Amino acid sequence: MNVYTEHGFASRAEYLLTLSDEYDLPLAVVELVASQLGDTEDFDGLLVELSSIRELRSYSI
């Protein structure tokens, strides 16, 4: 069992796809941020970054 299955996901890919849906962000954005942070940040720093990106996208000029 790995950290993703412990949290109810079949794989990291499934987890990132779920985050893409939850944060209403393109999967490519989620994958890019995840690759930059590394998998050790998947359940901490990644969530903070995705939340920040979602908030920034809510502003319009």
Task: Go through each PLM region and give its residues.
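Short, charge-rich amphipathic interface segments used for partner binding and complex assembly
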Residues: 21-61
